[in-house]
Amino acid sequence: MSSKEQKTPEGQAPEEIITEQHDDVEAVEPEVSAEQVDPRDEKIANLEAQLAEAQKREREVMLRAKADEDNLRRRTEQDIEKAHKFALEKFVNELLPVIDSLDRALEVADKANPELAPMVEGIELTLKSMLDVVRKFGVEVIADTNVPLDPNVHQAIAMVESEDVAAGNVLAVMQKGYTLNGRTIRAAMVTVAKAK
């Protein structure tokens, strides 16, 4: 037996012992200095940063486009709703003089004359049916007295002293006003009470 074989533990070949000793030693990688950085790594990092920035810009553009689309859809819906609501405005404006004429005819008619009673009744029924029809389409009459003056629906043409009506309230309606779905299409011409 040689001296090498004597030093090895029983049953182990000398190669196995050397392998075990190498396993105990940690692999040490050589340190890379800043000067030895691979230029490809730097280029990859630069390209990744550019890609992230481009993705961020694209995301912002998509969000802005979606917001613009939502705003356009909302505006279009509002415009369509207004068009439906106020499509009758011109037609109602054309009917107002007819309604006013029927009102004036009733004011001046001699209701005490029995010969005119059928005509007066016909005018009243015609006016009532016309007002019923326009009410179905959102038209409301502004003709209340003893209510506070509202510049949105009233046009004051005179101020008169009154003890019966509070100052600043509508005393009399000279010409009725009308609204269409809440929008004033003709303000009521009124006289307003003032304090003595």
Swiss-Prot record:
<protein>
    <recommendedName>
        <fullName>Protein GrpE</fullName>
    </recommendedName>
</protein>
<dbReference type="GO" id="GO:0042803">
    <property type="term" value="F:protein homodimerization activity"/>
</dbReference>
<dbReference type="GO" id="GO:0006457">
    <property type="term" value="P:protein folding"/>
</dbReference>
<dbReference type="InterPro" id="IPR013805">
    <property type="entry name" value="GrpE_coiled_coil"/>
</dbReference>
<dbReference type="InterPro" id="IPR000740">
    <property type="entry name" value="GrpE"/>
</dbReference>
<dbReference type="GO" id="GO:0005829">
    <property type="term" value="C:cytosol"/>
</dbReference>
<keyword id="KW-0143">Chaperone</keyword>
<comment type="function">
    <text>Participates actively in the response to hyperosmotic and heat shock by preventing the aggregation of stress-denatured proteins, in association with DnaK and GrpE. It is the nucleotide exchange factor for DnaK and may function as a thermosensor. Unfolded proteins bind initially to DnaJ; upon interaction with the DnaJ-bound protein, DnaK hydrolyzes its bound ATP, resulting in the formation of a stable complex. GrpE releases ADP from DnaK; ATP binding to DnaK triggers the release of the substrate protein, thus completing the reaction cycle.</text>
</comment>
<dbReference type="GO" id="GO:0051087">
    <property type="term" value="F:protein-folding chaperone binding"/>
</dbReference>
<dbReference type="InterPro" id="IPR009012">
    <property type="entry name" value="GrpE_head"/>
</dbReference>
<keyword id="KW-0346">Stress response</keyword>
<keyword id="KW-0963">Cytoplasm</keyword>
<comment type="subunit">
    <text>Homodimer.</text>
</comment>
<feature type="region of interest" description="Disordered">
    <location>
        <begin position="1"/>
        <end position="41"/>
    </location>
</feature>
<comment type="similarity">
    <text>Belongs to the GrpE family.</text>
</comment>
<dbReference type="GO" id="GO:0051082">
    <property type="term" value="F:unfolded protein binding"/>
</dbReference>
<dbReference type="Pfam" id="PF01025">
    <property type="entry name" value="GrpE"/>
</dbReference>
<dbReference type="GO" id="GO:0000774">
    <property type="term" value="F:adenyl-nucleotide exchange factor activity"/>
</dbReference>
